[in-house]
Amino acid sequence: HRFEVLGSGLITSDPIDWHCDFKSGFKWPHGKYYKKYIRVNKGDNSDVKVPIELSRCHHLLWLGEAYLITQDDKYSSEVVNEICHWIKENPYAYSINWSCAMDVAIRAVNWMYALNMIMDSKIVDDKFCKQVTRSLLEHVYFIFHNLEKGAPYSGNHYASNLSGLIFLGLLFKDIPSVRTYFDFGLSELYREIRNEVLPTGVHYEKSISYHRLMVELFAYPVFLLQKAGFDVPLDIYYRVK
């Protein structure tokens, strides 16, 4: 595996070390309860964003796209193997990669998109589906019980939490507890959009780069809700359009 994360330079890691800051060489210990980790230590030059960014699994979407284009199972196999390896190396709530609900939500949605692209591959078997389903249930439980709501305004972290609850809530809509998470996420998503997005569609902080991020975090769940047959309020639609 060769990749670059947040200016680390080209790194080779096989198997992938999900706990390492490749820029400084610092590694967060395995098997520690997520609330006991020190994310920022001013005594060294470690950057927790490096392992966390890698564990968001954005790169799995590229592998999924490669499979769709080529139908080559080497790409679907890599998606499956990386997810299985991540689950093994990051038991629920016991790694640095469970320390922030925003990252948990982003990872879950990326997994869902990547898996959707490779579902017709013979590599995706029942054993794997059961394993990833269990992990995604852990993800939605974690998000709901670690919400990052701010006051008087929330921001990208809370929006990510709510987006994750919408995506995972629709996936597991037949599970009563998850339906509760979804209902909460839906009402809060609408409230946050009305609070944070001006009627003109501009985010209240009026920062171009931040506006771009918030558009993604609000628009994707709204469009998913529409696709799932929900009647999205007109003012919500126009704020994210």
Short names for language-model regions:
Residues 30-31, 37-41, 47-241:
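Aromatic-lined, polymer-binding surfaces characteristic
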Residues 1-42, 49-53:
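Extended, charge-enriched "interface" segments that sit outside catalytic cores
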